[in-house]
């Protein structure tokens, strides 16, 4: 496995792979890797001749500087895991390598067709501009055939599909396939997340109520309206000491707009467990 720190070296290595006709699978990450990431990487390794993983905590997608500073980082540990999984290349640049100071100062602009106006986009202004900025740059460097994203970040996944398939950038990504990968959960049911590292053992036990409530809502949805289930989920989670719902939206999986119909519905939740912000979702 080769660890690459510069765009120039990455482009050189990827060009060699393309010349050799090898299929390239790509998994973009921000590090602090866990079994959820590992499942994406295993799939990428199995389905492609070359597997590339990026490890980069992207500053342009954080609208909270404290959150950026607290985001867990351990490249040595991450690299050991990726080597064991059979990854060929790890791209681990610095922010200065990825962006000029001018790019850091300027607001990246993109037409999201309204996908960024709800949920995470509403709560974290500018977040998805940063996501598209870094993912498009990584795609341009890696030129993958397949790119793997987890469904836990459901809104992000919808926006990446839009970027590749329907946006003004689509022509750049002809032949690129976005692979949706299911949420990986701990034995307790808690959705795996790098942010879980910031939870105490007691907080992890408390946070299990998030997924338990979402799974229970599948039964509630059989006899109740969307609005009734939405309110019941919020009330149930908020009743747990130590948890506070930021939002729970039941949306159409394609448009991300709130829906009153169970067809194509996805429930997306963000909950604070102490100071740690956790997300999860469930398909109805």
For each feature predicted by the language model, list its residue ranges.
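Nucleotidyltransferase catalytic core that binds NTPs
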Residues: 2-242, 251, 255, 275, ...
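Substrate/ligand-engaging "lid" and interaction regions
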Residues: 248
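A short, glycine/Asx- and small/polar-enriched loop/turn
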Residues: 259-265
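Generic C-terminus detector
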Residues: 266-284
